[in-house]
Amino acid sequence: MTATSFLHQAKQQPHHTEPYIKALEAREYIIEQVPEELSKPKVAIICGSGLGTLASGLSAPVYEVPYEDIPHFHVSHVPGHASKLYFAFLGEKRVPTMILAGRYHSYEGYPIEATTFPVRLMKVMGVEVMVVTNAAGGLNQGFKVGDLMILKDHINFPGLAGMNPLRGPNAHEFGVRFPPLSDAYDLELRKLVYDAAKAHKVSRTIHEGCYAFVSGPCFETRAESRMLALMGADCVGMSTVPEVVVARHCGIRVLAISLVTNNVVVEESPSAKDLVEVDSNVMSKGAANHLEVLEVGIAAAADVRTMVETIVNFI
């Protein structure tokens, strides 16, 4: 059955939900742009800030589809997010893979359901494993800039407050109404990261930890950072978790990797009163900025790409 006829039949069925039909419409467009052997990717990779170079150096053939051409996709206006979808074979086993070079965020004004639409596209295209990367601030005082953290848990603050990508009528074609998330991050995939790092003698320190999702676009205050750290978060960022929630709803296995691009300031702000009394001057330190994030991301992309290419051989 062709993609067009499949979509036509789905539209004739009144029980199908709008998210499912939209995903099929995007799929129909994409499979017209890529050869059949790449039209059913097994793995999908989402590249975070500065990590878009993960898509470079792919073995030919590589097929590029701009986000702006895909039905129901949006374009990111954040530096470091190219807004292009690539299809290529990855790893020694030439695993068909789709790579999202950049993501669009809810802080850009997009509904959270829109920011996670690419994950539902993954599902209807046949993706079994999603590898998602991000740039994050290090809350754990043992983490250094340039370290990697494999997510083993998360804290979804916007989700707890009602900004959940699964809100509204359940898109039953993808999953159940109340999906469990106690083991959202696949243990076997996490083990493969350490195996790959060892095999390729990756010198970067690799941690496992908990990621706190905040909506942004402001970086965290000192008090907010201390609160997150006290709650058990090791890193903090403005993405990933909504994608993970939708992926697990779809039954897609998840591996998520954070690159620590800055150390979050958790110390209390200096007291103006105390400084006046001791006639001292203290400079504020540690203000985060996006340029710093991009620079660290670009420097780390090669190591991340090496590990991901190795991991896909065992999926």
Swiss-Prot record:
Q: Reaction(s) catalyzed by this protein?
A: a purine D-ribonucleoside + phosphate = a purine nucleobase + alpha-D-ribose 1-phosphate
Q: This protein's superkingdom? A: Eukaryota
Task: Tell me where in or outside the cell this protein is found.
Answer: Cytoplasm; Nucleus
InterPro entries referenced in this protein's UniProt entry, alphabetically: Nucleoside_phosphorylase_d (IPR000845), Nucleoside_phosphorylase_sf (IPR035994), Pur_Nuc_Pase_Ino/Guo-sp (IPR011270), Purine_phosphorylase (IPR011268)
Its annotated pathway?
Purine metabolism; purine nucleoside salvage
Catalytic activity, EC: 2.4.2.1
Q: One MF term in GO for this entry? A: purine-nucleoside phosphorylase activity
Protein name per its UniProtKB record: Putative purine nucleoside phosphorylase
Task: Give the originating organism.
Answer: Schizosaccharomyces pombe (strain 972 / ATCC 24843)
